[in-house]
């Protein structure tokens, strides 16, 4: 326990919690331009070609964003919206591309979890 004199000389410092998504600047989403769209391989023990994009955000950050869903239409200079959320088996990927927003098309022929992939309701 600190004495009153110690607290007068050096007050208690508030705890600083570290964010997992620093590039978002406490915003829910950020817009950015794709600088590179490519595939990468996950960590062991998984095996795949995961689709990712290198994105230059409006605040100047350059981040790697995962492109979820089957198939995509992204290429260099596409304008996309990103959200937080890491991909556990891809080191350094802390953001997700939002499907169905800006230049990123939704997943066609998606029947379930449509809202997560920007898919319209199918004509029954």
From Swiss-Prot:
* Entry keyword annotation includes Transcription regulation: no
| Molecular function (Gene Ontology), one example | structural constituent of ribosome
Q: According to the UniProt entry, which residues carry 3-methylthioaspartic acid?
A: 89
Concerning InterPro entries, the annotation shows:
NA-bd_OB-fold (IPR012340), Ribosomal_uS12 (IPR006032), Ribosomal_uS12_bac (IPR005679)
Q: Where is the signal peptide?
A: none
Q: Does the keyword Oxidoreductase apply?
A: no
Q: Which Pfam families match?
A: Ribosom_S12_S23 (PF00164)
Give the CC-aspect GO terms: small ribosomal subunit
Lineage: superkingdom: Bacteria
Give the record's GO biological process terms.
translation
Keywords (A to Z) from UniProt:
Methylation, Ribonucleoprotein, Ribosomal protein, RNA-binding, rRNA-binding, tRNA-binding
Tell me the protein family, please: Belongs to the universal ribosomal protein uS12 family.
HAMAP family, A to Z: Ribosomal_uS12_B
Q: What does this protein do?
A: With S4 and S5 plays an important role in translational accuracy.
What subunit structure does UniProt give?
Part of the 30S ribosomal subunit. Contacts proteins S8 and S17. May interact with IF1 in the 30S initiation complex.
Protein name, please?
Small ribosomal subunit protein uS12
């Amino acid at each position: 326990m600190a004495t009153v004199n110690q607290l007068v000389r050096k007050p208690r410092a508030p705890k600083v919690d570290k964010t997992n998504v620093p590039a978002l600047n406490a915003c829910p989403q950020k817009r950015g331009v794709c600088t590179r769209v490519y595939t990468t391989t996950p960590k062991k023990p998984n095996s795949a070609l995961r689709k990712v994009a290198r994105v230059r955000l409006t605040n100047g950050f350059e981040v790697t964003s995962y492109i979820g869903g089957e198939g995509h239409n992204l290429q260099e200079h596409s304008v996309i919206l990103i959200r937080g959320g890491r991909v556990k088996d891809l080191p350094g990927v802390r953001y997700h591309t939002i499907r169905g927003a800006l230049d990123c098309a939704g997943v066609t022929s998606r029947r379930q979890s449509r809202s997560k992939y920007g898919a319209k309701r199918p004509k029954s």
